[in-house]
């Protein structure tokens, strides 16, 4: 239960950064976690996890409430997870000159895909130029919680030339049809498994997560029946739509990332 506590281990650094978005025409703020030793070895490059918050939150949520930096520090110190960069962006966007959104929305839910374009056209190129990343799909993952889970699924699964791992915590699965969902990405199970090293679904079991759990489990079972192998489903019994659930999700998800294929 202490996996998200501050321990006597090497610590990474959480960096606050501003950058200019061509999509929105505005300056945007992000949080970037760099792992222990990032500044010591100027030659080493790292894989990147793009990690999204939920509705009503912002790019600081995963650090201030999720304690993601301490979770990663501890996993890396225990050699359970590989050192990685984690990027946290604000999940709302409007195109330059567009009217403000009446309600916050993820990709395909009112912003006309603006946030999706921010990630693909602005954020990733900036991160790859500003940090020592491994700039290829095999070393790039996207995940999120609640609203961010839906964003991760849509952006990740419809851009498999960019991402090889997709994670959804407490959201996004719904009643997806394996043959048509996300542009039909699941229609060819063998092809999907060649491109995606992991599709990870996680949920609590009570409160708001009770319905989400049902949908995520159903999608997982349908994908397994369809022949998709690189999909995992985990739940946290007795926990709901809350940060404790998502801390556990990240703690289980991160060790699965960027491992060498056996």
Residue ranges and their predicted role:
Residues 1-262:
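Non-catalytic cap/lid and distal C-terminal segments of serine-dependent acyl enzymes
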């Amino acid at each position: 239960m202490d996996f998200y506590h501050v321990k006597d281990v090497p610590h990474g650094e959480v960096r606050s950064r501003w950058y200019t978005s061509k999509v929105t025409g505005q300056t945007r703020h992000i949080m970037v976690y760099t792992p222990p030793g990032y500044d010591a070895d100027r030659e080493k490059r790292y894989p990147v996890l793009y990690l999204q918050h939920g509705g009503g939150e912002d790019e600081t949520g995963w650090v201030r409430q999720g304690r993601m930096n301490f979770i990663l520090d501890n996993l890396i110190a225990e050699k359970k997870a590989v050192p990685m960069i984690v990027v946290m962006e604000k999940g709302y966007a409007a195109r330059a000159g567009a009217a403000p959104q009446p309600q916050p929305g993820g990709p395909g839910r009112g912003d006309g895909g603006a946030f999706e374009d921010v990630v693909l056209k602005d954020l990733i190129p900036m991160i790859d130029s500003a940090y020592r990343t491994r700039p290829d799909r095999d070393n790039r993952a996207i995940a999120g919680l609640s609203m961010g889970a839906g964003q991760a699924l849509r952006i990740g699964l419809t851009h498999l030339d960019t991402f090889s791992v997709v994670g959804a915590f407490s959201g996004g699965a719904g009643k997806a049809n394996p043959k048509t969902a996300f542009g039909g990405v699941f229609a060819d199970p063998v092809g999907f498994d060649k491109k995606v090293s992991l599709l990870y679904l996680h949920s609590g079991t009570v409160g708001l997560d009770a319905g989400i759990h049902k949908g995520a489990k159903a999608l997982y079972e349908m994908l397994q029946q369809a022949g998709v192998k690189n999909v995992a489903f985990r739940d946290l019994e007795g926990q709901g739509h809350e940060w404790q659930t998502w801390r556990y999700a990240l703690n289980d998800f991160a060790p699965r990332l960027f491992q060498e294929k056996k």
